[in-house]
Structures are given as C-alpha cells and as structure tokens.
C-alpha cells in the first residue's frame, strides 16, 4: 500500500473515530437533558419549541396549528428571502406572492380577509411584524379583524389593507407611505413603537433600520445564526446552554458600557426623533386630503398594569431576545416608560392613542404575549377593539 493510500486510510479512521466521539457526546448530552427535564418544563427550548408547547396565550384561539407551522423551517423556506428595496427604503419578500401555513402574501402585502370587492374608502395600516401578524393566521391579524369589525357594524364598503412588515420602524413606514398613492378620504393608521425604541436604545441609531443594522453586522448575525442552528440540532449545545443558565440564574450581564448619561441621551433623542416622524406623517397625510391616526403599541418592556406570573416568567426567559447586557434591558424598559409618559403631551394636536396598558391579563385572566412584543390572536382581538373604538368616530 502506497503513502497516499496510507494517508487516506489514516484520515478515514480519524474521521470515523471523531464521528463516533461526537455521537457519544451527543447521546450523553441527550440523556442528561432527558434526566433534567421535568414533566411540566423542558430544560431548554428554542422559540419554535416554546410555541409548540402551546403556551397560555394560545388557550382560546382557533389558529394555533397554523401559527405553530408558521415558525417551522418549512414555512421559512416557503416564504423565501427578505430583500431591501433601497429606492423605496423598505424591505420586502423576494416573492410577490406565496401561501405558507396560514400566511398568504398577495402582490407584496399580507392578505387581509373579508375585503369587499367594491369599496368607497380605504384604511391603510402600517407597522412592524405586529401589524403583519406574527403569531396569528391571516384571518386573525389586526387588519383582518378590523375589516371584519367594519363589515359587521357598518353598511359602508371600506377596504382594509395590511402594510405591516417585520423589523420596520416609523422611518421605513413613512418611506413606504410616500410610495403609495393616497386617495381622498383614505384613513392611514400607524401602529408602532416597539421597533423604534429597539432601534434607538439598542442599535443606537433612530434614523437607521434594523435590517440595515443586520446587514452592517453580518459577522455577528452569522454567529447568531450558527447558535440558532445548533440550538435546534445539537444536544451538546443545548446542554451547555442549560449549564450556563444555571450559573447565571437568568441574571443579565454587567457589560462594560454602563453609561447612564448616554442611555438618557439615547432615550431622549430617540423619543424626539419618533415624535417628529409622527408629525411628518400627519402633515403628509393631511396634505393628501386623508386622515391620520397613530397608536403606540403595548409591550412587556413597560406598562402601568400589574404583570401576571406568566409575563414575569416570559421576561425572565428572554429579557431582550438577542442581547443580555443589563444596560440594554434597562434602556428599553426606561425608554418605553419615557415614550409612554411623554407621548400624549407631545402630540396634543394629533389623533394619538397610547395602548401601553391595553393588555391586562391580571384583570381579564387571559394571556396574550408570546415574547416581549408579539401577541397571539387573543391579543389582536383586544387591540382591535381599542383601535375600532377610535376608528368608528372617524367613520361616522
């Protein structure tokens, strides 16, 4: 046998031994995870796994199976790639049309159910993934529920259109609005705040975009994607995550950027930027002979109402979702509080509505949030009622 053959055999033997070793470690980790698993709670959960356990917010909804599938890898492949349209300044799916596990895209926008074929007026709703409807099927998004509410309570032919999209801030919403022809008597609704606070407090750039930040930090995002992949495929990685969480006891890390003055400046500047954009939208809509209504969305980052035990646990599991530095958690919580407390006084001459305290599970005995910002259709139903109460004054 020649040198090349010997080297090949040696390489194959080492490869087999490495594969066997990895398999043994994976099996050992799997057994430890099984032993550590209690009847009520797994030792480790990825977000899709968390959804698959059917947490409390899905108790009284009719679209759980569709939502569960929407968080699967199959659904992600079905939807395809998100690209950024630099000319407009707004992201979009590479596909213009798809139908994927309860989510249907038609001509670039998510399908709103029960739309009339003939209509005399439109309601255009802009926002991030909470308007798009992450956590609900097409029929249970906020725009679809508003459409159904209008159909049931008025004899007017009004068409509701869902212009929500994941990660967008008020900057991108305004960009998109300016690229859509507004008709006389249209009603334009902006429902936002969460992504704007995140962009200002975490990415420290209120004028930027979350997708733009991701594109500028591709290496960090690549590492996060690897971690996400391992969290779904490797028992060893899951076990390491469990061990780490036991040592940290879910405490936030004290990073080296505990600059309170900087945080206060980011909060103040972020709020001023947000308010100025809302006013710009209002001026633009009025100039086009339409009506503008703004809503500050609820979140778990801050509210005046008492938190339920479920909400406390949810915050504990994932303080921010991507960054565990204590300063970032404090910024977002303080930022949301600052936005909420100063929102109404800063927009006195505008139809502005603070929905921070809309979702109150302690009072209603029903849960809504599946993470710090997103809700199930149970939450969408409550939010729809609040929006419709404001909207019907304009419709009458």
What are these regions (language model features)?
Residues 11-14, 29, 274, 343-352, ...:
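Histidine-centered active-site loop/cap adjacent to the catalytic His
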Residues 22-40:
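Membrane-interface motif at the C-terminal end of an N-terminal transmembrane signal
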Residues 39-132, 136-139, 143-149, 363-364:
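Membrane/wall-proximal cationic-aromatic binding patches
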Residues 195-344, 363-366:
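Serine-dependent acyl-ester chemistry module
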